[in-house]
Amino acid sequence: MASGDESKRRLTILGSTGSIGTNTLDVVERLGGRNRFEIAALTGNGNIPLLADQARRMGAELAVTADEHRYGELKDALGGSGIEVAAGRSGLIEAAERDAGWLMAAIVGNAGLGPTLAAARRGADIALANKECLVSAGSLFIEAVAKGGGRLLPVDSEHNAIFQVLENDQRHAVERIILTASGGPFRTKSLEEMRHVTADIARAHPNWSMGLKISIDSASMFNKALEMIEARHLFRLRPDQIEVIVHPQSVIHSMVGYSDGSVLAQLGCPDMRTAIGYALTYPKRCDLPIERLDFAKLARLDFEAPDEARFPALRLARRAMQAGGIQGAVLNGAKETALEAFIKGRIGFLAMAEIVEKVMDRLSDLPAAVTMDDVFAADEKARLTAAGLIQ
């Protein structure tokens, strides 16, 4: 475990201006702000005014923009504050390596891999919201966390739920885990209807408030596909132990089934601050003004099997897990390229999964990753191959 004064935790937030990052700071302030947390570093990308405001408000020691061209703008925005400023990939690594016992890894995409890995190697306790660390880097990242000696605390609501109900002394008795999925905005849509949806329609999630890309990933169920791969690495599971069930109310966040037939579930209103608060204050629980479940008003919980004909991302995740090696990075890289093309209106909604499958077919013989350079190389090949299919 990372060292530090438990009465005031030193925290770095990678990706503080995004959806997870802003909610993390909301939780930090609700838990006492600067009286309970020391903010070692905050990082963002293009939203310089918000990053500067966050850094000043929280008394951060260091503020970093991932965009090297915005360094001067950030420095000017923080003039006279005494807050250090850095930019680019080296700045992100500097933030991750700064002495802080706790780190929120909320940078979206491969840009978060390097700095999160750096934090793992130095032994930080990591609240993990970046999917690529596990989907693309998998065993390499888990190995780095183990060698560093820190803890890995999942922030995804589904994995956080499993983490909460998984009995460490009973891991040998785990039979399966069941990831719940809302089904997204197209749960009841036909294939023909799904052919004509736009990014604006796909971003409208029925239960959760999220950013554009993750909302569309939820609509296509690629988000759930990535969570399946993450769960395999986080909880050391076989692919056949991971199930997905559609649960439209998003009240049960995930379940663990044991060999005696028992199933333990974590329930709560759909609010990402619950998982964030749990990860930031672990092993203690914190007081948060989250809406409480009223079971009398809830009345019912619904479940249905996912339709993999309409949502083939789940099938592709199983294929990637069974193949092992570098296929998680291939799936993710191809998905990211297809997602960008869909957002720009260059391909249809259903074409995203079709492109990912074709890329996996073409790159099925890539060797397993030995280093992070192998991961980045596979990701680049997948993106280039997908781009070629889109043209």
Swiss-Prot record:
Q: Where does Mn(2+) bind?
A: 156, 158, 227
What EC number is given for this enzyme?
Answer: 1.1.1.267
**Can you tell me which residues bind NADPH?**
17-20, 47, 130, 132, 211
Which catalytic reaction applies to this protein?
2-C-methyl-D-erythritol 4-phosphate + NADP(+) = 1-deoxy-D-xylulose 5-phosphate + NADPH + H(+)
**Entries under InterPro entries matching the protein:** DXP_reductoisomerase, DXP_reductoisomerase_C, DXP_reductoisomerase_N, DXPR_C, DXPR_C_sf, NAD(P)-bd_dom_sf
GO MF terms, alphabetically ordered = 1-deoxy-D-xylulose-5-phosphate reductoisomerase activity; manganese ion binding; NADPH binding
Q: What are the required cofactors?
A: Mg(2+); Mn(2+)
Q: Which Gene3D superfamilies match?
A: 1.10.1740.10, NAD(P)-binding Rossmann-like Domain
Question: Does the record bear 4Fe-4S in its keywords?
Answer: no
Q: What pathway is it annotated to? A: Isoprenoid biosynthesis; isopentenyl diphosphate biosynthesis via DXP pathway; isopentenyl diphosphate from 1-deoxy-D-xylulose 5-phosphate: step 1/6
| SUPFAM superfamilies per record | 1-deoxy-D-xylulose-5-phosphate reductoisomerase, C-terminal domain, Glyceraldehyde-3-phosphate dehydrogenase-like, C-terminal domain, NAD(P)-binding Rossmann-fold domains
Ligand binding (1-deoxy-D-xylulose 5-phosphate): 131, 157-158, 182, 205, 218, 223-224, 227
| GO annotation, biological process | isopentenyl diphosphate biosynthetic process, methylerythritol 4-phosphate pathway involved in terpenoid biosynthetic process
**Entry keyword set:** Isoprene biosynthesis, Manganese, Metal-binding, NADP, Oxidoreductase
Q: Which Pfam families match?
A: DXP_redisom_C (PF08436), DXP_reductoisom (PF02670), DXPR_C (PF13288)
The record's comment on protein family reads:
Belongs to the DXR family.
What does this protein's UniProt record list under function? Catalyzes the NADPH-dependent rearrangement and reduction of 1-deoxy-D-xylulose-5-phosphate (DXP) to 2-C-methyl-D-erythritol 4-phosphate (MEP).
Name of this chain's protein? 1-deoxy-D-xylulose 5-phosphate reductoisomerase
Q: Which gene encodes it?
A: dxr
